């Protein structure tokens, strides 16, 4: 096979529209219920297929090796091992999503790597099989491979496609890094939210069980959330630090973005129930 270049594979961000922690298992993992929705704000990856199993990553990130970089290479290596593929790839990452913000950027990069290389290497795995590989890389990876907004249960691996409204979001990124591990290890984290049916959850007020704890531990998150709540219904996504406000119209979100204090960064993006990654895959 001669080297070929495939451009513009999106790795979209996600929002947790709600996140409920139901229990802690004996193995330390947490049972949860959450609703994932994609937003049209993405990292982008380019791939060049190589005739040898070599894997090489280029990134626009200043740090030498970041978590997302590791996951990209781990994803590619895992696909090689699962399929005994003897091809390799040169990969370019255009990193646009904030790191460690609860938007799933590293997991999304890994998912896009698996989906793209499965196509380009012609390894022929189904999305379900790719999801099995992805789950070993991170609990959020399967939802990005699944490619549709989803209600997730268990530790996040049990997915059911859903179609919530697709509003505009203003996403703000406080300049702090929240450790997911520390949040889930904190004794003050609520772990007893009752499990509810999907129908009940979709018709109940949405909340993030991690939000109160994170806001208490990270004043910048609390300050940013309080500012955004002045303009729209707002919550934290994942374990933070990013928070989002919901708007019916794009211009409404942009008007609030224009008022943003200089100390806070943010962007406007539309909710998407079909992942931009699936739309890119359909072009192949």
Curated annotation (Swiss-Prot):
Catalytic residues (UniProt): 14, 140
Reaction equation(s) it catalyzes: 4-CDP-2-C-methyl-D-erythritol + ATP = 4-CDP-2-C-methyl-D-erythritol 2-phosphate + ADP + H(+)
Gene3D superfamilies in the record: 3.30.230.10, GHMP kinase, C-terminal domain
Organism field: Shewanella pealeana (strain ATCC 700345 / ANG-SQ1)
Keyword field: ATP-binding, Isoprene biosynthesis, Kinase, Nucleotide-binding, Transferase
PANTHER family xrefs: 4-DIPHOSPHOCYTIDYL-2-C-METHYL-D-ERYTHRITOL KINASE, CHLOROPLASTIC
Role of this protein: Catalyzes the phosphorylation of the position 2 hydroxy group of 4-diphosphocytidyl-2C-methyl-D-erythritol.
Protein's name according to its UniProt entry: 4-diphosphocytidyl-2-C-methyl-D-erythritol kinase
Pathway: Isoprenoid biosynthesis; isopentenyl diphosphate biosynthesis via DXP pathway; isopentenyl diphosphate from 1-deoxy-D-xylulose 5-phosphate: step 3/6
Pfam family, one: GHMP_kinases_N
Enzyme class: transferase
Amino acids binding ATP: 98-108
UniProt cross-references to InterPro entries, sorted A to Z: GHMP_kinase_C_dom (IPR013750), GHMP_kinase_C_sf (IPR036554), GHMP_kinase_N_dom (IPR006204), IspE (IPR004424), Ribosomal_Su5_D2-typ_SF (IPR020568), Ribsml_uS5_D2-typ_fold_subgr (IPR014721)
């Amino acid at each position: 096979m001669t080297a070929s270049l495939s451009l513009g594979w999106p790795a979209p961000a996600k929002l947790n529209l709600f996140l409920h922690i139901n229990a802690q298992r004996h193995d330390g993992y947490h049972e949860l219920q959450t609703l994932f929705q994609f937003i049209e704000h993405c990292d982008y990856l380019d791939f060049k297929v190589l005739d040898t199993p070599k894997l090489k990553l280029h990134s626009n990130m200043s740090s030498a090796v970041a978590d997302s970089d590791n996951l990209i290479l781990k994803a590619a290596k895992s696909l090689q091992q699962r399929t005994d593929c003897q091809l390799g790839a040169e990969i370019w990452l255009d990193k646009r999503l904030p790191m460690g913000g609860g938007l799933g950027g590293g997991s999304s990069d890994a998912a896009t790597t698996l989906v793209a290389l499965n196509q380009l290497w012609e390894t022929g795995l189904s999305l379900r099989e790719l999801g099995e590989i992805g789950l070993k890389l991170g609990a959020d990876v399967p939802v990005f491979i699944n490619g549709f907004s989803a209600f997730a249960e268990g530790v996040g691996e049990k997915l059911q496609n859903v179609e919530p409204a697709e509003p505009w979001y203003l996403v703000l990124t406080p300049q702090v890094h929240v450790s997911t591990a520390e949040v889930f290890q904190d004794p003050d984290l609520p772990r007893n939210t009752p499990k509810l049916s999907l129908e009940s959850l979709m018709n109940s007020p949405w909340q993030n069980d991690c939000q109160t704890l994170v806001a208490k531990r990270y004043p910048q998150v609390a300050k940013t959330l309080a500012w955004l709540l002045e303009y729209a219904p707002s919550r934290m996504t994942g374990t933070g630090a990013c928070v989002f406000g919901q708007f019916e119209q794009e211009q409404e979100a942009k008007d609030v973005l224009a008022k943003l204090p200089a100390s806070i960064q943010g962007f406007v993006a539309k909710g998407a129930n079909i992942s931009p990654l699936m739309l890119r895959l359909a072009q192949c």
